[in-house]
Amino acid sequence: MGCHTRLLWLLFFHAAILPEAACYRRDFRGSGARLGKERPKRSSIQGVSEEQQEGHGEEPAARPQGDGNPATILSVLPAAISTQPSSKLAPSSSVSVLPVADSAPGSRRAHAPRINLKGADMLPDLTPVIDPESYKPSGGWAPVRLAGNHGSCAGRVELFYQGVWGTVCDDLWDLPQANIICRQLGCGWAVSALSEAYFGQGSGKILLDNVHCKGHEEHLEECSHLGWFSHNCDHSEDASVICSDAEYGTVTLSDPPLAAMEGATNPEKSRCGGVITSAPGKIKNPPMNEMHDNITCVWEIRASTSEHIRLAFPSLDLDCTNEYFEILDGPPSSTKSLGKPCRGLHITFASHSSSMTLVYFRGENNIGKNFMAYYYFEAKEMTTKTPYLITIPTATSKMVTERPQFSNTPSGNISPLPVSDSGDWPELRLVGGSSRCSGRVEILYQGVWGTICDDLWGSNEAEVVCRQLECGQAVSSLGEAYFGPGSGEIFLDNLQCSGMEHYLGQCPHSGWSEHNCGHHEDAGVICSDSDAPPPPMPPGPPPTPQDPLTGGSNSCGGVISSLSGSFTSPRYPENYPTDIQCVWEIHVEKNFRIELMIPNLNLEDILGCPYDSIEIFDGPRIASLSMGKFCAPSAVVFFSSSDILTVVFRSDYMTTNTGFYAFFNAIPQDGRESEERPVLRLAGSSGQCSGRVEILHQGAWGTVCDDLWDLNEAEVVCRQLGCGHAIAAPGSAYFGPGSGNILLDNIQCSGTENHFGQCSSSAWLDHNCGHHEDAGVICSDADVTPSPTEGSHSCGGVISNLSGSFSSPWYPTNYPTDTECIWEIHVAEKFNIELTIPSLK
């Protein structure tokens, strides 16, 4: 582990009751002055003039200059006068967090690349016109228009207020604000949030500044702002948007797309990976000195269960062979890939679930390039379309192709077919298999049958094919002309399905007959209703004489119904083929569960397993929890919670290895609960609900390694011990190193298990750790409440005081590595909370 400079922080909070006549919010975002321009300081108190504010305390802070650390302030006001209650508070809390202006150094948002609209001067003025005399606002909301002669869905944002049209300042302007404008105008969603008078300077009044939205608002005025006509801007900073329904001439990129945005992101999100739970925000590339060869960064974005996630790349220009992203519709264990973008303009993704994962890969001998991604949360009920990849019309976009040797030309635009309710989609058939539910996928287009290229072909696409053909669920998605090469046209390439579509025609693709493939890459599927096993792969070794297992399978996937058995990756122990996906679904009798053991696992071992992997699902693959995704050489053991277990094996188009050998046994359900429920204790602290996790095995106590250790595992420990829920999951021997054996490593829990024995892990005593990596937990019932006046060095806890302070562990010395702490602050019902972070390093 490399050495990094560690920064520290200290926080203070207090609860207060303020007069109900006004809602005072101090502007801590600072001055956004550009070089050579000095801005006057402005009031941030909505609806109160500068003269009226005399005597109300010190003047709002100027925008910070240089690299000073920001002070994070959560204004805490009586709940009764809060107009923007948070939607993410625990039900037991009445706390309302009011948004304040951005405090990032420099305070200016990132600016999107300049777009030239060719022929725009010849367009008629399509800006909506409202007669001030005849206008009567509906519901009291100000009308909105997009000006600048670029159509009704792209342009400078203008609002009609008190009889005049005016503009909006671009301070804090970003995708959540732009998305509300697009939604309000019926123009889809925001593709770009543009600033610095991108579509030309407006005239007249500047109506709003520091607009800050959460994303669920229906009108821009519902967002927090400085107040009508209160700003520190001029028309060179007018805000603009481009919506997804914009229709205008050729779009070209003329300015370096990311140079203007570099440094505008929160530094916490420029590291290589992490978990993100707040929005909106930006993710940028790690510092260049940290972008080593063969680096993989994994970011997981988590929204609430009522929201989904939108992600936008203003521009990508990566080496599509050795540097690209993969976007997963869910957590890192998700099998639903939304795409592998590497090059293009305004590439936008939408998740179907409440989480999304970005996997960034950079190979050898590659000069890493800058990138920036914007994300925000949106209520699920606002989504009316299946998630798909979309690009601005006539823009160029390129996805990673699965055959670099045939990638001589860009794959073209990726665009979805229009969705209709008629069900009039192209006809499909499966050819070359043993039944109508397995074979090479062929599609009827303009009266001719043709094939589909296997680039980006995966389980989502196979699932849609099986659904359209009424053949059950997808068992395998196969490439490389598994069922033999077809003939004639190759109609489709780079198909991208979410897995929820009813017809393959609803999935986006590169365009009819647009491909870079040959028939040796024809895609195939095996569906669950296939009445015969798939064509056999070259046989693997028979079980050893000591191994009594039967009912095994060396083919690529299938349904196994027996009390014991074995199966291997195709061609085992020789190298498995590239570009293949196999799904084994194991069924045992209803009163049994399944023990799965993989004693030998040799795949392409890359952090995060983005290429080759084996993933275990606790039940049928559809709608079952993932028990883990693995690619590192190790012995793993899993126990199902029901009579079904699913194993998914995937390989990509490049490196292969010898694969794996797996066997399973049926275990009676009645006996497993007591046999597999381990005895736990927490050591190294003063209470029973916080400490180093220790487990009893074969009469001796041992510790647990912190690899993959997080709140999910800690939650199960706290539940089993009756200690409430998990507040923190510290690693690095936070409670001191243990002694004796390290019993478990790579533990993976979903967080819903009743006891620790239901989580997957490496085998007993199989680890690569030392006691300096012992895992710990802090549960909500632990006695770690800080003093109301003195700082606490505990890692998390529940605080129930009217004022107090707390700090990062070991403050003011460096905090420990591999630690996650959660403090939950409770005050009286009629109070909200003000949180101040004067020192953050």
Curated annotation (Swiss-Prot):
Domain CUB, residue spans: 272-378, 556-667, 795-841
Biased composition annotated in UniProt, kind: Low complexity: 85-105
Known glycosylation sites: 294
Gene Ontology CC annotations of this record: membrane
Region (Disordered): 32-69, 85-116, 528-552
Name of one Pfam family that matches: SRCR
Keywords: Disulfide bond, Glycoprotein, Repeat, Signal
Ranges of Pro residues composition bias in the record: 532-546
Name the record gives this protein: Putative DMBT1-like protein
